[in-house]
């Protein structure tokens, strides 16, 4: 059956034909580009043609930003002198409309503050390998993000309870907290107590390799009465493992 002439999608190409990517409808181009990360768009996709560049400049393209860093670039000169400026450009293109950002490895105090200063409407912040800046960067950013609803942190060193308290006090709308430790774990309930004390609105909490005991667990269950899901994975000081659904 032949395709309808009113179809919004381009007809299939015949053998020997070539697609003119510049003639794709803007909504289809946008759908394609949204499957790429911020770096791929800014380094490559926006250079395909003028029409693609126009789509890439649209603030609606930058409501969600995924910054995926290749492992071989971690700690490289290119990461900080090429990639970081591109990521700042992505934040600028959102024109204050950024709602969600996920960052792999490219985490430092100045960049986190750059995001927070220009994205007061941010709802989700996800960072991987943020050990060098957890004490200042995440806390300083959180103080400028009162609408933040989800915080997802993967870190190597211990989190201080004072830092979590500031986050909880600065982000009253926080509903999801994920703390994933990839380093050494110490038996300690301070983090759990900080969560219980300052984050009563949590609905979803995930702790990976946390040193809390049953005392900390009970404090969380009492201090966060709206919890729907509590995921405890490799938390070796308690007997409950897996997801607790209330």
Swiss-Prot record:
Record CDD domains: F-box_AtSKIP19-like
Ranges for domain F-box: 18-65
A Pfam family recorded for this sequence: F-box-like
InterPro entries with a match to the protein in the record: F-box_dom, LRR_dom_sf
Domain of life assignment: Eukaryota
Protein name: Putative F-box/LRR-repeat protein 9
Organism listed in the record: Arabidopsis thaliana
Upper classification of the organism: Eukaryota, Viridiplantae, Streptophyta, Embryophyta, Tracheophyta
